Structures are given as C-alpha cells and as structure tokens.
C-alpha cells in the first residue's frame, strides 16, 4: 500500500461515527491534537526498518502516523469495543497487525521474533503506567527504545535525582536500563475526554549494558525496593529483611562506604550498586 493512501484519522469524527463510549475504568483519553502524534513519531525516530509495537492504539490516531514511517506496526488493544473500529479503519493495511489482549499478559518475544530494530510507542493509561514500564524494562525484551506518553508526575519520577522528593524505585529502574529524553509536554486540551493532569512524551533509549554493573541484579532491585518502601527509615532499618547476620551486614555497609544511618533517597545509582555487591559478597561467603 502506498503511504500516501494512508489517511489521517480524525478522532472526534470516529468517536461519533461509531458511537464510541469512553471507559473510565480503562483510563481512556484519546488524542485530538494532530501535532502530538507527529511529534511522538518524530521523537521515537521511527524509520522504514522498524517494527513498532503500539500499546493502546485507541481509534488509531497515532497508529496511522506510525504506519506511514515503520516497516510494520503491531497494536495491542485491551478494549473489545475498539477492535471492530480498528479493524474497519486499518485492517486492510498489510503493515498493520492488531492483537486483542492485555499488554501486561503479552509475550513480547513472540511478537518480536527475529526482528532487529524494534521500538515501542504507547499512550499509556495512567493507572497501569508503572506496571507496564516495569514489565517492559525487566522482561529482557529487545526494544531499542520506548517512547511513551505518561502523566507528568511519572515522567518527573523517572528523571529524578537523589535527595529529591520524586526520586524512588522507578527512578532507579529507568536510569539503570535507559537514557531518558523529554520529547514534549502535552496539555489536557489535546485529549478527549480531558484528563485532570498534564502529560509528557518521554523517550527511554535502551542502554546496551545497564548503567551500573552489579553482581546480582535481583538482590540489587530487592535492596532498592526495601529502601523506598520505607523511605523515611534509615537504610539499616530498611534492609533488615535481607537475610544476612548483623555483623556481616555491618561489614557490607563498611565495605561499600555507606553510612547505614542514611536514607535510601540519598543514595545514587552507583551507591545502591556498591551496597548490593557488598551484601551479595557476604551472602555467598
């Protein structure tokens, strides 16, 4: 199909045409500003060699722009009422594949197969943003990048530095696996229905190797989780659930050069890595 034959989708027109009813439980907000999908595609640097996986295509407003640039687009949609709309509007395009499923239950490796250049693009429902990001980053999938539209506050948490109120486990997770770049801000007026918060399009560029090298990744994230689950407590109290005798835990803190009276929110990524490696050493002695 000639890309010139791919017509832009007018969200409001399709919503009226199909008498679509928005689902509050699914957190649906569809784009109506034509500049946003184009900026997302440009920000994701989509090109003709790319397989693009889109989560939450809605009525296909962003999907159409992806189809103009990508080799292939696989869209994952949970809402059964959107399946016939997407099929009717985009089903004839040989570059388009639609999967009716929950993105949290999808095996992305089955979709990716042998593809070498895979990018994920998504307008994520706010209520599942963090679980989806955790799954995508820790799942070991071969994504070059994730370009996602999310709540402004979540984007700020991803980019947060130590000693900041937004700094937490999500900051560590994202910065461990990715470099981040803000593509653009998106005000509520760009959607129907209008959300009550501002949104941001952010690109997560997957690093070839994690930003910090750790011996035991599972333990590393366990320590991070303990530190931020009890963020007002000292590291010493927060890591009491780690199964290591007191005297060995003291040695681990000393070896890592970290005062156990500090709070988790003061530690850099590198310091969490050093503490994790020191604890791992004594756990395996």
From Swiss-Prot:
Binding site for S-adenosyl-L-methionine: 29, 31, 56, 77, 102, 123
Molecular function GO labels: 16S rRNA (adenine(1518)-N(6)/adenine(1519)-N(6))-dimethyltransferase activity; RNA binding
Domain of life: Bacteria
Record flagged with keyword Endoplasmic reticulum: no
Cellular location(s): Cytoplasm
Cellular component, GO annotation: cytosol
A Pfam family reported for this protein in Swiss-Prot or TrEMBL: RrnaAD
Enzyme Commission number(s) of this protein: 2.1.1.182
Alphabetical keyword list: Cytoplasm, Methyltransferase, RNA-binding, rRNA processing, S-adenosyl-L-methionine, Transferase
Catalytic activity of the protein: adenosine(1518)/adenosine(1519) in 16S rRNA + 4 S-adenosyl-L-methionine = N(6)-dimethyladenosine(1518)/N(6)-dimethyladenosine(1519) in 16S rRNA + 4 S-adenosyl-L-homocysteine + 4 H(+)
Keyword RNA-binding appears in the UniProt entry: yes
Biological role: Specifically dimethylates two adjacent adenosines (A1518 and A1519) in the loop of a conserved hairpin near the 3'-end of 16S rRNA in the 30S particle. May play a critical role in biogenesis of 30S subunits.
Family affiliation: Belongs to the class I-like SAM-binding methyltransferase superfamily. rRNA adenine N(6)-methyltransferase family. RsmA subfamily.
Protein known as: Ribosomal RNA small subunit methyltransferase A
């Amino acid at each position: 199909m000639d890309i010139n034959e791919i017509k832009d989708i007018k969200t409001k027109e399709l919503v009226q045409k199909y008498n679509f009813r928005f689902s509050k439980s699914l957190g649906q907000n569809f784009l109506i500003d034509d500049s946003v999908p184009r900026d997302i595609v440009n920000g994701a640097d989509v090109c003709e060699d790319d397989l693009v996986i889109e989560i939450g295509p809605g009525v296909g407003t962003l999907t159409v722009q992806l189809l103009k640039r990508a080799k292939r687009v696989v869209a994952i949609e949970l809402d059964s009422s959107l399946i016939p709309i997407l099929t009717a509007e985009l089903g004839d395009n040989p570059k388009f594949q639609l999967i009716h499923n929950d993105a949290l239950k999808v095996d992305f490796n089955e979709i990716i197969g042998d593809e070498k250049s895979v990018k994920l693009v998504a307008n994520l429902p706010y209520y599942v943003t963090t679980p989806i990001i955790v799954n995508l980053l820790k799942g070991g999938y071969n994504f070059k990048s994730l370009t996602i539209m999310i709540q402004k506050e979540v984007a700020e948490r991803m980019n947060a530095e130590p000693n900041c109120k937004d700094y937490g486990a999500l900051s560590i997770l994202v910065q461990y696996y990715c470099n981040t770049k803000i593509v653009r801000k998106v005000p509520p007026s760009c959607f129907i229905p209008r959300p009550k918060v501002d949104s941001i399009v952010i690109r997560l560029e997957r690093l070839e190797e994690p930003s910090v090298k750790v011996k035991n990744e599972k333990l590393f994230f366990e320590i991070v989780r303990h530190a931020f689950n009890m963020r007002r407590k000292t590291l010493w109290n927060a890591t009491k659930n780690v199964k290591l005798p007191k005297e060995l835990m003291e040695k681990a803190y000393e070896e890592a050069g970290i005062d156990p009276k500090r709070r988790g929110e003061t530690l850099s990524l590198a310091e969490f890595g050093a503490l994790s490696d020191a604890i791992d050493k004594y756990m395996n002695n």
